[in-house]
Amino acid sequence: MGSQHSAAARPSSCRRKQEDDRDGLLAEREQEEAIAQFPYVEFTGRDSITCLTCQGTGYIPTEQVNELVALIPHSDQRLRPQRTKQYVLLSILLCLLASGLVVFFLFPHSVLVDDDGIKVVKVTFNKQDSLVILTIMATLKIRNSNFYTVAVTSLSSQIQYMNTVVSTYVTTNVSLIPPRSEQLVNFTGKAEMGGPFSYVYFFCTVPEILVHNIVIFMRTSVKISYIGLMTQSSLETHHYVDCGGNSTAI
């Protein structure tokens, strides 16, 4: 009999212990939830003020008003910014796009200088000195492929006849070439051929010759400046000049 009573009492005591443990766990969990929901409050007596960012439920010391910025619970959504990765990626893409556009528009492109021929030739004869004076207006075509204005800072030209320099022309601050455009630049050189080339005078004044063509060689150099860079283009061209037409005698 005694053994049967003790065996029956043992399961009931175990069951009661399990129920007590379960009730204890539930009580601890309820206490933790209550603490988590309870707002932060600093009880410092009269030396405290209401924390505005805590919706009036928390307090901070008066002397730390300028030091403490905010008291935000861990569950506040402000601590979990939305779409942060998307915003960062978008910012990076925008920066790359802006950098690419800046490089594309500011990257120096070529400025092409081409010869556009001789427009006007005025011939003057000096019979006394057997001298031929050629006043030649030549034209250059300058093409600007950049997205900004370029400046033609200087232009120099030499006219040669039979490998001898007979004229030199130099000028500065020539012209400004607008973006993505081309412009014609005219310059005038004066060549005098006499002395060892006095035979040119007789050749150009012989009436029996219908066409009085002579060949001159022109070496032209152009300096161009843009966004802190300086480039130089050179041209070497040969031209036929009729020294018998459009002439005057002095």
Swiss-Prot record:
Keywords: Endoplasmic reticulum, Glycoprotein, Lipoprotein, Membrane, Myristate, Transmembrane, Transmembrane helix. It is found in: Endoplasmic reticulum membrane; Membrane. Residues 16-25 have a biased composition (Basic and acidic residues). The keyword Transmembrane helix applies. The chain crosses the membrane at residues 87-107, 197-217. InterPro entries: TMEM106, TMEM106_C, TMEM106_N. Residues 1-25 are annotated as: Disordered. It holds the Pfam family TMEM106_N. Its main location: endoplasmic reticulum. Belongs to the TMEM106 family. PANTHER family: TRANSMEMBRANE PROTEIN 106B, TRANSMEMBRANE PROTEIN 106C. This is Transmembrane protein 106C. It comes from Homo sapiens (Human).
